[in-house]
Swiss-Prot record:
Gene (UniProt): rpl29
Keyword check for Transport: no
Record has Ribonucleoprotein as a keyword: yes
Organism for this UniProt entry: Methanosarcina barkeri (strain Fusaro / DSM 804)
An MF annotation (GO) of this entry: structural constituent of ribosome
Leader peptide range in chain numbering: none
A GO cellular component annotation in the UniProt record: ribonucleoprotein complex
Protein name: Large ribosomal subunit protein uL29
SUPFAM superfamilies for the chain: Ribosomal protein L29 (L29p)
Disulfide bonds: none
Pfam family, one: Ribosomal_L29
């Protein structure tokens, strides 16, 4: 899943943002489960990228009074 930039997130509809947020949260859970099970993630920086993208989406939702 590609990391989204602020402009891309703003261009999404309300439902698309909510779906993307749900997908990113589930991906974050999978990555953390892999790490906690003792496995080495394919891309160690991916967890940070996912967290930052989630924060971007939530920030924009807050700015647009969607939360």
């Amino acid at each position: 899943m590609a990391i989204l930039r602020s402009r891309e997130i703003r261009d999404m509809s309300l439902e698309e943002r909510a779906d993307e947020l749900e997908n990113l949260n589930s991906e974050l859970v999978r990555e953390r489960a892999l790490t906690s099970a003792g496995g080495a993630p394919e891309n160690p920086g991916r967890i940070g990228e996912i967290r930052r993208t989630i924060a971007r989406i939530k920030t924009i939702q807050h700015e647009l009074n969607e939360i």
